[in-house]
Amino acid sequence: MACKCDCKNKQCKCGDKCECSGDKCCEKYCCEEASEKKCCPAGCKGDCKCANCHCAEQKQCGDKTHQHQGTAAAH
């Protein structure tokens, strides 16, 4: 039960570890809900949400992504 990172804040208040998936997430976007445990990669524009993790006009984010382009390289 360490500190929690905010999705809107790319800088984690706690400079230790995130409850998401490693400190890497902390630096980028971490879900404030441990139940979701999801993180947005740096491929997002910056206004990504952890709950849905969907990018406005950028590459796939993670979970829900609008496949507007013809790229189907989803893990």
UniProtKB/Swiss-Prot annotation:
Induction summary: By cadmium.
Superkingdom field: Eukaryota
Single biological process term from Gene Ontology: response to lead ion
Gene Ontology terms: cellular component: cytoplasm
Family named by the database record: Belongs to the metallothionein superfamily. Type 6 family.
Function: This protein binds cations of several transition elements.
Molecular-function GO term, any one: copper ion binding
InterPro entries (alphabetical): Metalthion_nemt
Organism per entry: Caenorhabditis elegans
Protein name (Swiss-Prot/TrEMBL): Metallothionein-1
Domain notes: All cysteine residues are arranged in C-X-C groups. These are thought to be the metal-binding sites in other metallothioneins.
Name of encoding gene: mtl-1
Keywords: Cadmium, Metal-binding, Metal-thiolate cluster
